[in-house]
């Protein structure tokens, strides 16, 4: 019998690019499932002890799973959440400096790359690290809600026409379904729900439910539409009357008028349609939650307190009008910046507010309070007034704790355990760099007994002070994990595209990879040390109050530094033929290790001027002028002189 030669047909996998024959495809599914399994060679943030890392073999193409790894990376990049760098708070996370002073993109090798490559790297990095860079029960990975996306506040003409076209197509499909012989479609919503495409006055409803979006057909502005029960509509109207500007504004101050306009917008409307009361409130593109999510662990304590100060100001105004906010979730406050680059905060949900005398009614029982924000007295069976001014202070404390640390002060997997934790357990602070001033504010607000909590006026006086420019959510462990992901990411991109792209598009990746390797060595050394000692040194540097003699020494040293700055500026101005610009530093701008000698202020073993941007400039100025020694100071009638300081900390300045 003559043998017939059988041709094998090859099939290409669209994702991996690997070609398989029909014989291979006819094999058991077990091997193909193993090949499609998510590879373990991807960068993993967390416990890496149980996951082998064979990146170097993969990048050198010595491993057979390289096509699968590359396909998985490309798949993640395509499905990564996009970040718009034009909006505030959306600085590309791939461009953050892990340690040392923050650097703008123009000062780093990444700044020489084309924008599309930077965006690809950033989307890749965000997909790999979001939700893994912070511990469980955090602000942006708590599992209660999906990730909050930015929404437009104003639709252009094309977007509005596209919306109307989608609504018309949906209406046609509904009419076709109604006239067809198939089974009728049952509306799962009640008559109180808003329906997508419904027109109410000049508003077009966008979405379905009790809370949806609405677009004004005249201005194309985006609103939030809330369906109010009949009993609640009258209560909301009472709140509006108390907060809005009266006809005679002579009795109100300028701040009260400004706060009234923030709480009650002039474009807000309450419309009655089909026995429904609908509250139309103009919305903003960002909330405190979205801003904190975008900044991740790069947010500083000063940023947090500047936003929190605006929230406290809103609460003070509402309490002065006998109105209680009730809802203190970060999602419940819109956030934007005004023309003067200052924060503007206003409440999102007016329907959650209530008047003081309404709290005894059963309809308001725990309706507008999220469980993690409940005060201990609200969880008792004999409680009659479920919300009061003291519970407002507790909610403010929970909000500040979330903004400072990125997670809830009380978190459990079940409601009974959460209730018991709130009532009986004390909150704990993570090993982050948070000043004791902010900790004391939270501790005084989260007192179990309502009578022992800080009152609102004392809180207002406390939040108006100065706070350090230190990343309050950051610690050495997180930064080390962040550096590992960046180093592997840059290395893979460089080895993958160095033979395919122009040198100018791959050499910056190699330089960033080398910088990550240098920083990784520093982070590894810092992580070996006792983290508590680093934290204590940080706290002591921030919070120690100097004595009178220390203040005198600091002022003399500061005069020396400002004089050197002035002389340097004058010489540069003469060379550039311009007027000199006056540079005046304050004592709060410079670390005490540079302002005070080691004899009267012990220098931390972990401190070096290169670790702070201002200290680095001042130290270089003093070194260039050969003026590291302290000037003579009179201690009573005795002149005192001190030698130059000696720093034993790690120098992180680039070599």
Curated annotation (Swiss-Prot):
GO BP, one annotated term:
negative regulation of gene expression
Its keywords, alphabetically, are: ATP-binding, Nucleotide-binding, Nucleus
Tell me which tissues or organs this protein is expressed in: Expressed in epidermis, pharynx, intestine, a subset of head neurons and motoneurons.
In Swiss-Prot or TrEMBL terms, this protein is called Protein nipi-3
| Annotated segments matching region Disordered | 1-35
Subcellular compartments: Nucleus
Annotated binding of ATP, by residue: 206-214, 235
Deletion phenotype, per the entry, is: Arrested development at the second to third larval stages (L2-L3) and lethality between 5-10 days after hatching. Small and dumpy body morphology at the second to third larval stages (L2-L3), abnormal pharyngeal morphology, sterility. Growth and fertility defects are suppressed in a cebp-1 mutant background. Lethality is suppressed in several mutant backgrounds, including tir-1, or kinases nsy-1, sek-1 or mak-2. Levels of phosphorylated, active p38/MAPK pmk-1 are significantly increased. Increased levels of cebp-1 mRNA in multiple tissues.
Write down the Gene3D superfamilies for this protein, in alphabetical order: Transferase(Phosphotransferase) domain 1 (1.10.510.10)
| Domain Protein kinase: from-to ranges | 200-470
């Amino acid at each position: 019998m003559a043998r017939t030669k059988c041709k094998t047909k090859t099939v290409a996998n669209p994702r991996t690019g690997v070609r398989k024959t029909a014989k291979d495809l006819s094999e058991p599914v077990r091997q193909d499932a193993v090949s499609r399994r998510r590879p373990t060679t991807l960068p993993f943030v967390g416990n890496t002890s149980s996951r082998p890392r064979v990146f170097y073999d993969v990048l050198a193409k010595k491993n057979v799973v390289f096509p699968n790894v590359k396909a998985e990376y490309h798949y993640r990049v395509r499905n990564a959440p996009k970040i718009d760098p034009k909006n505030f708070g959306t600085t590309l996370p791939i461009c953050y400096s892990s340690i040392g002073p923050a650097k703008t993109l123009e000062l780093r090798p990444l700044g020489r790359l084309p924008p599309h490559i930077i965006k690809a790297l950033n989307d890749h990095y965000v997909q790999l690290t979001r939700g893994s860079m912070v511990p469980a029960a955090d602000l942006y990975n708590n599992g209660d809600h999906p990730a909050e996306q930015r929404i437009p506040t104003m639709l252009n003409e094309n977007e509005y026409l596209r919306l109307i076209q989608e609504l018309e197509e949906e209406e046609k499909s509904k009419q076709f379904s109604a006239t067809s012989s198939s089974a009728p479609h049952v509306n799962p919503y009640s008559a109180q729900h808003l329906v997508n495409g419904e027109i109410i006055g000049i508003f077009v409803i966008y979405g379905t439910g009790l809370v949806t979006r609405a677009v004004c057909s005249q201005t194309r502005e985006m609103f939030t539409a809330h369906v109010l029960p009949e009993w609640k509509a009258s209560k909301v109207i009472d709140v509006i009357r108390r907060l809005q500007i009266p006809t005679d504004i002579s009795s109100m101050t300028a701040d009260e008028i400004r706060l009234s306009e923030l709480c009650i917008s002039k474009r807000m409307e309450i419309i009655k349609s089909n026995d429904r009361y609908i509250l139309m409130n103009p919305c903003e593109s960002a909330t405190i939650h979205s801003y904190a999510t975008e900044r991740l662990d790069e947010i500083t304590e000063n940023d947090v307190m500047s936003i929190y100060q605006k929230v406290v100001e809103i609460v003070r105004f509402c309490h002065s009008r006998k109105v209680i906010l009730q809802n203190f979730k970060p999602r419940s406050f819109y956030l934007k910046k005004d023309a003067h680059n200052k924060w503007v905060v206003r409440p999102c949900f007016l329907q959650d507010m209530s008047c003081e005398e309404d709290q005894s009614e059963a309809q308001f029982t725990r309706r507008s309070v999220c469980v993690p924000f409940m005060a201990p007295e609200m969880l008792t069976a004999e409680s009659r007034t479920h919300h009061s001014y003291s519970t407002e202070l507790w909610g403010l404390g929970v909000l500040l704790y979330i903004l400072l640390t990125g997670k809830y002060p009380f978190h459990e997997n079940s409601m009974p355990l959460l209730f018991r934790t709130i009532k009986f357990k004390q909150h704990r602070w993570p090993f982050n760099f948070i000043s004791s001033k902010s900790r004391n504010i939270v501790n005084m607000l989260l007192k179990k007994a309502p009578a022992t909590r800080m009152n609102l006026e004392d809180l207002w006086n406390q939040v108006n002070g100065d706070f350090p420019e230190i990343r309050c959510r950051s610690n050495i462990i997180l930064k080390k994990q962040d550096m590992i992901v960046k180093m592997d990411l840059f290395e893979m991109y460089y080895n993958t595209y160095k033979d395919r792209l122009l040198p100018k598009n791959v050499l910056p990746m190699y330089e960033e990879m080398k910088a990550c390797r240098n920083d990784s060595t520093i982070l590894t050394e810092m992580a070996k040390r006792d983290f508590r000692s680093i934290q204590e040194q940080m706290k002591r540097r921030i919070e120690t109050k100097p004595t009178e003699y220390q203040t005198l020494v600091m002022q003399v040293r500061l005069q020396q530094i400002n004089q050197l700055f002035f002389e340097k500026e004058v010489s540069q101005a003469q060379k550039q033929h311009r007027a000199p610009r006056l540079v005046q530093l304050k004592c709060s701008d410079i670390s005490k290790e540079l302002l005070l000698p080691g004899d009267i202020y012990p220098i931390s073993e972990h401190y070096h001027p290169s670790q702070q941007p201002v200290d680095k400039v001042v130290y270089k100025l003093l070194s260039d002028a050969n003026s590291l020694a302290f000037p003579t100071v009179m201690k009573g009638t005795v002149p005192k002189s001190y030698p130059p300081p000696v720093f034993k900390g790690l120098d992180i300045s680039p070599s």
